[in-house]
Amino acid sequence: MCVPGCGGTGKSQLIRAITAYFTQTNRVHKLRKLAPTLVAAAEIESMTIHSFLGEGRNRKKKSKTIDRPGQTKLENAWRFVEYIILDEMSMVGLSLLARLNKLVATAKHCDPMTTMGGINLILFRDYIQYSPVFDKPLYYNFSTTMDNNTTNNRKLSTENEIQQESAPALILQINCVVILEQQMRTKDLAYRALLDRVRNGEGIHEDWLLLRTRVVGIGLHISLNDPPWNQ
């Protein structure tokens, strides 16, 4: 499942509501919340994907967690989990998603062909935000690059490239998309229109003029034509 929406449409509130529902119904042990960054994880009271995978900043040290099907700690962590909320999906890369899929399949003792070990995956946020670092975004299309590489003498794929090329099959399993469109944070119609244009890279001169009026402090007018802003 995928729940996209621009800023201010209530995505974080929805995640909190889902968490509250699982807590009140005594099923919070069936829910896992993950995010690609520490800030995003703190926002929804979750943990980072890298921490959950047992990966530090130096990925040269391979995680021992993923390759041990009989590891009790790993099995206990996922024994009752049925739902994964994956926040900030724009920053989640294909390789990262593939590694998460491998870990869950190992923990659940599932066929590797079973998506996410049979667990329901719910992606949140907005594709039109920060892209993943040193990874391909979830919407990346390999068809063009594969055609080009076929004509050239393509080298053997690395483990990271294999993960990236296999992960799109996971995305294609999404069979439900709920788009959040109602803006809950901003009621100013002109400012909302500005945000929509800037989000899509379609800003106009009037947007710049409007932003110049959003100055903190009464009577404080600063020109962008004056130093140091014009440098």
Model-predicted regions and their roles:
Residues 1-231:
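Conserved ATP-binding/catalytic motifs of P-loop helicase motor domains
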